[in-house]
Curated annotation (Swiss-Prot):
One of its GO terms (molecular function) is iron ion binding. It comes from the Eukaryota. Its EC number is 7.1.1.-. Residues 55-84, 95-124 form the 4Fe-4S ferredoxin-type domain. Keywords: 4Fe-4S, Chloroplast, Iron, Iron-sulfur, Membrane, Metal-binding, NAD, NADP, Plastid, Plastoquinone, Quinone, Repeat, Thylakoid, Translocase. NDH is composed of at least 16 different subunits, 5 of which are encoded in the nucleus. It catalyses: a plastoquinone + NADH + (n+1) H(+)(in) = a plastoquinol + NAD(+) + n H(+)(out); a plastoquinone + NADPH + (n+1) H(+)(in) = a plastoquinol + NADP(+) + n H(+)(out). This is NAD(P)H-quinone oxidoreductase subunit I, chloroplastic. Its main location: plastid. Belongs to the complex I 23 kDa subunit family. GO terms for cellular component: chloroplast thylakoid membrane.
Length: 167
């Protein structure tokens, strides 16, 4: 008879312990319910990129001296620089400059080592397309400045703050 009583007592203790664990986990869940969300609704809300963000490369054709330093420092020899030598003035004349962003790793070496600062990184990071050949930007496409996320009234921008406010 005693083993049966101790079995019921042991069963009761296990039930109380299980109920306590369930209650503790429920309290933890409720404590997280009043916190602000960490995620954002991406297409409609965007984070403002940091100052040193490495996005699409912007190219200024008039500043380039066709020295090809960008090609030499690129780990994958990506920028394509076409030039011809003007013998009368003894200078290189830039004909074409292109970068294929389907291959680019956005390391920023070309921007860092450019002696004339004709290359710069923009805040544009949405380069997706259905055709990979559209990612090959020539000097005209590289010269376009991206539309700023801050000026777009259809997108709510969120500053780099520790917590995101919800509406």
């Amino acid at each position: 008879m005693f083993p049966m009583v101790t079995g019921f007592m042991n069963y009761g203790q296990q039930t109380v312990r299980a109920a306590r664990y369930i209650g503790q986990s429920f309290m933890i869940t409720l404590s997280h319910a009043n916190r602000l969300p960490v995620t954002i609704q991406y297409p409609y809300e965007k984070l403002i990129t940091s100052e040193r963000f490495r996005g699409r490369i912007h190219f200024e054709f008039d500043k380039c001296i066709a020295c090809e330093v960008c090609v030499r420092v690129c780990p994958i020899d990506l920028p394509v620089v076409d030039w011809k030598l003007e013998t009368d003035i003894r200078k290189k004349q830039l004909l074409n400059y292109s970068i294929d962003f389907g291959i680019c790793i956005f390391c920023g070496n070309c921007v860092e080592y450019c002696p004339t600062n004709c290359l710069s990184m923009t805040e544009e990071y949405e380069l997706s397309t259905y055709d990979r050949h559209e990612l090959n930007y020539n000097q005209i496409a590289l010269g376009r400045l991206p539309m700023s996320v801050i000026d777009d009234y259809t997108i709510r921008t969120i500053l780099n703050s520790p917590q995101i406010t919800s509406e």
